Amino acid sequence: MKNINPINTNAWNSLQQHFNNIKEVKIRDLFLLDSQRFDNFSAIFDNQILLDYSKNRITTETLYLLFALAKECDLPNAIAAMFSGQKINRTEDRAVLHIALRNRSNKIIAIDSQDIMPEVNAVLSKMRQFCNQIISGQWKGYTGKPITNIVNIGIGGSDLGPYMVTEALRPYKNHLNMHFVSNVDGTHITEKFKYLDPETTLFLIASKTFTTQETMTNAHSARNWFLKTAVNEQYIAQHFVAISTNANDVVKFGININNMFQFWDWVGGRYSLWSAIGLSIALSLGFENFELLLEGAHAMDCHFTETQLEHNLPVILALINIWYNNFFGFETEAIIPYDQYMHRFAAYLQQCHMESNGKSIDRNGNIINYQTGSIIWGEPGTNSQHSFYQLLHQGTKIVPCDFIVPAISHNPLGDHHLKLLANCFAQTEALAFGKSCQFIEEKFIMGTTSEQKLSIIPFKVCGGNRPTNSILVKQITPYNLGALISLYEHKIFTQSVILNIYAFDQWGVELGKTQANSVLSELATDNIVTCHNSSTNGLINYYKSWRYKTDDK
């Protein structure tokens, strides 16, 4: 990949001039000028996902210049570099090949001239066999009872992705009860224990290194809880499996090495749900549905690699975000799925976006003087309408939004889904077009005085011109969800290429982990701590003065 500072490109300079010319443009006027704006600013994928980006503050010239920026930053060759196994994660000297995990064409993908697909397929085959044993009841616990509850213990990418997918695809769920534990706060796992029976519970310990502090703390607590009933450590092998690369520590824990599922250093944590980390997905939904998830993602991979930039959905989304973040100064982006099953989708994308592109050093090692990653947040509609939409409509911060909604519901109860769709479509229209003084004045009832009108009208005006993308999915199926996740993954990668940053490391996360280990040893003693700044010293020492006292109020 070439390391190109985007603000030094001709396209960036042209975009700045273009922005100065159209920064006051109204979305309302763009629609008046182009009766075919929806047709000209929308794209469809596989007759399953429609992207409508017409309600944005962009023109055909904006897009022309944004695509020119992508080409000048060598995006097509960067895409080819990732898919061909080049080590584009240079700070860790690794390839980035989560796309190989869902390579349903099974074409050769090589790292250092070695085809990795045989290893990928071997793990998938092992996952299929294991899932069939658990789901069928063939796998028995230590008292001979089949497994009924599964607990995935992991954090970050080992939790957010699998949890999001199993929730989003609950209509496809089988009889197994799936639980997720991530937080090192003992409350998280303690609350799970209340509903579990050691005789019928299986734990999945998801940690690449098998040393992640939060995961291993929870794993050992689960082990201790299990042994209080089972007593004999030999039974651990029937109730614990590992998703890891650290065979030695897995065996020391008591897990049978045959029950360790491998993945590789070319799989980043936040892109790992396609790997053995997705074992919880396959167990919860059945392996056939896990394969459909992979197939949908692979189909979007093919779209990303084979479609011209001008019609490429991930590229379009990425460029629009760069346009808002760098030229308009819109710093955040809301992800709003109008589907209750998708309630964890925004949290999942929050990690993907912010851990990938939350960088301030470019690929040349220089401090960046432009904007990189946006702040990603969101909640499901319609709940969010009664939470933060007031700010979206009338606040001083403009927040570009992605509205995601299925055309077909899994639960066609009365007119519920029609009302959900109506709210989704109406909100994007209201955000774009607003409500003018004239419109409000016309709605006043007869007999209202001019003075009364003037006193209230300013508070009711909604200026509109708030940009949105609408993503209409035919139905939230395993295939379509896979494609949707892949769409956002490639959006993130596209942004990183153009913004000249490394998207697949996370050194900021590593810093916090290291310092936490240092503080942990200090918390274990009664000694007064003075080695930090006054704030950290004060917090630690107050904790020590309070920890043995119960609340008397």
Swiss-Prot record:
One GO BP: glycolytic process
Pfam families referenced in this protein's UniProt entry, alphabetically: PGI
Gene name, Swiss-Prot/TrEMBL: pgi
Assigned protein family: Belongs to the GPI family.
Protein name in the entry: Glucose-6-phosphate isomerase
Keyword Transcription regulation: no
Molecular functions (GO terms): carbohydrate derivative binding; glucose-6-phosphate isomerase activity; monosaccharide binding
Keyword Oxidoreductase: no
